[in-house]
């Protein structure tokens, strides 16, 4: 499935189906939270949280694609991510975009 951050697809006719979403919320275990807290004292990248964010984005994208597939979409345009903290150790990620179906295929 084609997924793009572009607002439009050029050179192809399509119809808009609906807005689609993929959502997930993740947290790390207490051991990784303690490690992150210690890293916060000395500075630098907190790899446990970077990995958590990457995994959450992948899951959100997979869910986005699945929702688009379920409504018969051929592509998703104007795809975006949004994320936010629910608490100190929980992160929510949303992938969203516009599901479209190609005409004359």
Swiss-Prot record:
SUPFAM superfamilies per UniProt: YbjQ-like
Residues in the signal sequence: none
Keyword Zinc-finger belongs to the record: no
UniProt keyword list: Plasmid
Annotated InterPro entries: UPF0145_dom_sf, UPF0145_YbjQ-like
Keyword Chloroplast: no
Gene3D superfamilies: Hypothetical protein apc22750. Chain B
A Pfam family annotated for this UniProt entry: YbjQ_1
Record family assignment: Belongs to the UPF0145 family.
PANTHER family (alphabetical): UPF0145 PROTEIN SCO3412 (PTHR34068:SF2), UPF0145 PROTEIN YBJQ (PTHR34068)
Protein name: UPF0145 protein
